[in-house]
């Protein structure tokens, strides 16, 4: 599955004709989004700019309540995965269509039927066909000026998605084609310092894993994200260890990219046994892993992540 309409390329966000009375949902500050909106030429809109990373269900309910009774034609998720995930969930609740526009190029959220929402301070991966964008717009305009930490976390996320998606039990020739293309492009972007390739690679990654799944690396990462570690940062070690465990063809290549991006080792406050108990119910990731995963395997992987510096 893919969005009903995909608009890609230089000036894509500038040339698109946006409906009036849209609600723009973003995580960024006025000094940044006002520049974006001027470029995009959007008129007669509302804006909600208080979305935080790993958005809570309470935030979504607050937005819905705030704009109940107002005439909203479209949700525009403008930013990283969190802004787009909030727009997806709101669209499912209200039936209002959504336009998704990434500015960080990592999650591939604009291409998928997935959304990550926090319930009781714990991230949960949700899937629903209603989360698919009505329009996805990918424009490299938003790339310049992206802080290094955001860029590297986003790139790692996209590469983890592509490589885990390639290995997934749900994969097929169609999804593996997109996952392979995405990884090759993203690897070239990082290793050979070609950041202009990141938007295209992330978009292809979203198509690939969005029609298969991510696997063990993502399942391991959420206990770190629950302790405040950015998602892409958590994946640097988690997906490296998962690829090694799975004997993935992407193990060495993924590790090399993470070394180039200079990710630091991860720490975990939660005891490994308790962390494994949190991870094991994540059947959406673990059941699609190429190798069957048991609790002792999760503990083994977590131990390597926090005690063996897998990126050294």
For each feature predicted by the language model, list its residue ranges.
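C-terminal charged capping/lid subdomain of soluble metabolic enzymes
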Residues: 252-312
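ATP/NTP phosphate-donor binding region
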Residues: 1-74, 265
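Alpha-helix C-terminal capping segments
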Residues: 88-97, 209-212, 226-228, 244
């Amino acid at each position: 599955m893919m969005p009903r309409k995909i608009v890609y390329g230089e000036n894509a966000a500038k040339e698109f004709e946006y409906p009036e009375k849209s609600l723009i949902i973003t995580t960024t500050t006025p000094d940044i989004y006002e520049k974006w909106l001027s470029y995009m030429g959007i008129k007669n809109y509302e804006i909600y700019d208080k979305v935080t990373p790993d958005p809570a269900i309470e935030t979504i309910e607050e937005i819905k309540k705030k704009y109940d009774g107002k005439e909203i034609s479209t949700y525009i998720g403008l930013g990283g995965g969190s802004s787009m995930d909030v727009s997806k969930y709101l669209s499912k609740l209200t039936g209002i269509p959504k336009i998704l526009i990434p500015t960080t190029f990592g999650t591939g959220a604009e291409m998928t039927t997935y959304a990550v929402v926090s319930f009781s301070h714990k991230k949960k991966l949700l899937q629903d066909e209603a989360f698919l964008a009505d329009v996805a717009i990918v424009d490299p305009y938003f790339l310049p000026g992206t802080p290094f930490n955001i860029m590297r976390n986003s790139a790692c996320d996209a590469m983890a998605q592509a490589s885990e998606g390639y290995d997934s039990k749900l994969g097929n020739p169609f999804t593996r084609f997109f996952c392979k293309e995405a990884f090759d492009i993203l690897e070239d972007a990082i290793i050979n310092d070609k950041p202009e390739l990141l938007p295209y690679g992330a978009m292809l990654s979203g198509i690939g894993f969005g029609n298969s799944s991510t696997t063990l690396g993502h399942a391991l990462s959420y206990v770190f994200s629950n302790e405040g570690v950015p998602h892409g940062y958590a994946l640097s070690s988690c997906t490296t260890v998962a690829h090694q465990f799975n004997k993935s063809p992407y193990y060495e290549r993924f590790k090399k990219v993470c070394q180039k991006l200079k990710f630091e080792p991860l720490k975990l406050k939660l005891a490994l046994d308790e962390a494994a108990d949190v991870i094991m119910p994540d059947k959406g990731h673990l059941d699609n892993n190429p190798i069957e995963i048991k609790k002792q395997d999760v503990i083994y992987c977590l131990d390597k992540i926090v005690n063996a510096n897998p990126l050294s």
